[in-house]
């Protein structure tokens, strides 16, 4: 019970341990397993950095730590909502990264719960600005909103933090900049107000504030329309007439619930100002000095079919670059639309717009000399928006820039050029948000924007980007210089007057500070003021507008005027959030292009260039605007490159062409760029200068390869959070690698410090020479460790460039790190160049094989997820199940898949059934086919008959002791005195004799007993052979004993059906039990998955299984118990029958108590083996088999490791079982000795009581019991050692499970639920193995204790009980023919030697002689209780060996000296002679036996119970009943063995009378010593010294004066004197009882007349000195000793006969001679008792008799 509690507690602990472990594993599963591969996982989220960063909300006016602020998270009430602007707009922070389904669910719930609530902006990190606007703002609505917010939290558990947007967070940081501080604060004359409008909550409150604050509404524009109910609106208001301070106005507006952003604006300070023969060479060939245009000339791309959008000052449509006779529209050569706010279609003189558009698309058909200065995309057209309000007034940009883009986009313009900027920067403002929003909404629309010209924005920074140029999605271009030769060529194309006047306007009119120039330095141009003179006279102006000074600078200052150097005026990044801007550089100084002549331009004006003199149709300009125009033309060429399919092989292939996205165009331009010079400003060059020639596949014998994933589906790939896309290639030669990733990012929020919304990451994995190198986007670091990779978290452009990349495999990885707005598209361009071969597409390396790192990844599996492991080819192995879905478990057997618990249980039952069928089949085979040696009845029919009659029969040794007197001894007794005898003693006697002389045998008290030695019928010729032993080393009667498992099982054959059914039910119980861990694992899965509703159903299944197990266990237990009871009853019956079939030698060798112990305890042991040990062992083996199946299905690795201690336990159990088997035999033998002693004591209880020997007997019994106790104590100690050792092995297995199993779970090799199941299965197998080991030792113990059972059951008696001839009647003619016989205990000492005697029918033959002479043995041989060693015994001439033994016994009967009665009634004892006898026959027999009278005198008469062994009767009564039993049998041959020797005179007379009646007409053989019995015989045979020394009638023998004569002298006390005895005639005709008795009376009368001769006493009690006390010196005068004594003395010459009863002490004749057996006093007491009964001596004569016997 304690063990079960311990296992249950341990299992519960492990369950909780694994449950907590699995929860932590679930939370970190993305760190342990991989969506695509191990390396992906390691580098995928390194850019997130510290987890704390993902908990921050980055706002311009605050950084909110949600882990600190969440203590009052969503603590909304009426008061707080009123205080927080009624709570219309909220910031909601979620646990990141944010997955697609979370985002979609948030949108859905906002719309449903808040009547059209929506996401307005994303704010890093993981935060959304959302609207939750109700129908009104009353108290009831606020209370309802609290409930809805809490409901939202419940529906979206990933919400970590949620609070209203506070007013302080809505104010732009521009208000704090220098340009709007101090005196300039008054220059803020406008505010831009962004608010969210809902149909349920209009902007009435804002309108009210405008009215109350005396603000003037300048403009109200819809900047985004998210759905039918919600809009984001921009309001621009004028502050000129307001009576309130700026701070008050801002505060009042910020408190409005609908407002989310406020920015400053100023009509005075904020200006939108505009910020190419040689440029063509630069962007196409990479250098202006290389006068080639391969994009135009080699592959023929000039922008055909492309439309460019542009918004600028206007276009001189009469210029030859644009002129067409067709009206502006789709048929116009260059301009398909012209939108002008003023309604004109002209540009100012030297207008910026004309120059920009000419740089992009300008081309002429009039003058070839001018065509050299055509635009970069000369075959393209333009959709133009005129932004100029008036000459010299700059640009008029409407508040909503998206309207500009929409107008050009509607004309199918996909590239738009903005060559202007405001002087606000470099913050991400509402203006920037609009630019990015439009491109997000139109992903094929690319805005190319100038980086701006260097302007001091009023803060201390070298970064000079404008708010527009901080746009993420726009291609922002900075200006780079062209070669000095280009500068010199452009000197005549500068409009110096225009430059001078522009400076004067900026300084004098607009008040701008330019290099410290004052208004007096730039007087108005007049006839008296020459601009060149004015410019050249001023050292500052000389560097700006003095042509000679500038020409000299062009020639001498190579530091500044060199190719690729960023222009000094070009805007420099980064942006305020640290992003890289500008993206690219393009030639912007100088650019010669079309010149506007203003309103006075003439049609198609385009004067030629003659003799190097500049034409008035062209003008040189510089600025980032010109660079933007050049880059725009390059973008147009790239679009055609993809649209017409040039990207495949440089030729038109429209079938593969597609419309590229803006991000692909941008990525391609950046991919071709290169940084050609070093710069002191880190962010000044972006990603370098454009070089489109890199797109050409073959140039100058170098090979360029492009991989454009967007071209596969003709659309950009899509990615979401947690996803990874891979593009892989290999290099066969060294080459340069350029990889560019660009995505159009959702618009950022002006509220946030950081603008990146969707975070993608680029990585390149290089596998070169077995080493892994990792490159990340925008990083120059090469990472070797995946955990150290750092990613760019700011830019939506990422670039990897590798110079001279070595041969190897390369995998490009695009990670969806945190896609907060789902379905982000992206573009990636992969280009290799410089190698001799093309890059080859290859299979992506799914992992990087590292022998020291077991890499794995998750994979899809039916009804579950799996894992894969990295192989040496950098590919993952086959998907192996890691975890099954809820309700499924993994079958690691045949199916290798996730199956239902029921299916796996059935599968296990099937396997277990097959296993059970094999086992049960083997058992049935044994039961049916194996022939049990123990139960085989044929063994009694297969005996070979003795070879009698020739004296040469073969005797086989079957002794349990020593075979001769010279063998070495093995003393296994408890004797206190050692002897020198060579006998093997197995007794507990304390006295040993040192004599080797012949031993005289005591007469057996019953037939087959006596003192002739232990009988044996084995052959004599093999008497010296080595003894035979069984498989365990035990000697067994010369016969092999089978105790194999098959023999044991076969004993249960009659109960095989019951046992088979019990085993079948037990197998069902095992199968049901094996389902329990699986059900428990299923419960764990449901608990783990949170599906608690299904747990109750599973628990019900669990309960049904338990109930089924209880029922099955009950039934199988009943059947096993029933089988056990039937087995024990049957085996006791079988054993008893086997005992009764044994020959008398068997019984002589064993004690009755021992046999009773075997019949009781040994049979119980066998029953325990058959019905307990073996079935339970089979059940436990089945449990082991089924459990092993399940354990190896779950995890073969864990199974092998956990079960490794068990073989040690099994080996230990094997040796321990063998030891227990041996020691169990000793215990059983010791208990048998004790039982034997107890049986003997109880059998002789009267003697014990008379001698008051109770304490002595108890002491002896205690001593014997202590022997078994000591042995059992030793066995108990070993049992304890074994139990503790086996327990240690069990706990060791549990420890290994905890250690190794947890590591397998953490490594993904094992699911948590399966580890739980494994833990629950482990006690099954450890318990079963322990049980098997215990049952094995129990089996060995029972086997040892049941050894004697099998010895008895399998012992084949030497005398065949079955078969042989049968006769219904015999004459009774018995003849001994040279019969020799020796007992098996002393085969060297013949008891009978060549005996020849004949017993004729109708005669009485008396056998007399010294005790131990062989008289009783002869009777036993006649009844064939033993086999003779030589000669033959015949009955009616037929050898008795040929007789059927039971039939032989039907003709022979015996009456023993001590009759054997049974504890039944008198009638039952008499019927033992004839079971079919009637009551009348019984009465008649009793009358003849003189027993009727005393029987009828008893209360119950013949039905009187006489008690055990007839204890209720006297000796004479028992003898007469025995005679009656013989009379009723009516035998032909009657054997009488001292029938009256123990009776008193009266009883003797009655018995003798009954004998006289019995002997008439039969062959009678009498063994007797009383003359009254002997003298009735016809023939007397004296048996002495193993032979018949005398034989004849009594008269003849008396006349011979031989041994019979001496016998008579002893009885009459006339030793040494002549007896004159007259015997009556004893003829057959005159003989009667009276005459026969007269013989005795005559002898007695003669003996009484003579005096008794004095007895000669010896000098020593143990001496045979023949001198008596009175005549010690006259020995010669003594009469010679009688022949009787001489015969005994002659017998001393022979070797002593050994008694073979194992526990009988044997004494030998002393060295001085004489014959005696046992204690002399005991013998004399017996002799005197007999003498008194015979009447030969009175009580006074007993001393003389004693002296005489001692003398002999």
Curated annotation (Swiss-Prot):
Residues 1-24 form the signal peptide. GO terms for biological process: cell differentiation; proteolysis; regulation of cell differentiation; transmembrane transport. Residues 962-994, 1013-1028 have a biased composition (Low complexity). One of its GO terms (cellular component) is membrane. The chain crosses the membrane at residues 909-929, 1058-1078, 1102-1122, 1174-1194, 1200-1220, 1285-1305, 1315-1335. InterPro entries: AAA+_ATPase (IPR003593), ABC1_TM_dom (IPR011527), ABC1_TM_sf (IPR036640), ABC_transporter-like_ATP-bd (IPR003439), ABC_transporter-like_CS (IPR017871), Galactose-bd-like_sf (IPR008979), P-loop_NTPase (IPR027417), Peptidase_S8/S53_dom (IPR000209). SUPFAM superfamilies: ABC transporter transmembrane region (SSF90123), Galactose-binding domain-like (SSF49785), P-loop containing nucleoside triphosphate hydrolases (SSF52540), Subtilisin-like (SSF52743). Required for a general cell fate determination at the onset of development. Required for the specification of an initial population of prespore cells in which tagA is expressed. Required for normal SDF-2 signaling during spore encapsulation. This is Serine protease/ABC transporter B family protein tagA. Residues 1059-1341 form the ABC transmembrane type-1 domain. GO terms for molecular function: ABC-type transporter activity; ATP binding; ATP hydrolysis activity; ATPase-coupled transmembrane transporter activity; serine-type endopeptidase activity; serine-type peptidase activity. The keyword Glycoprotein applies.
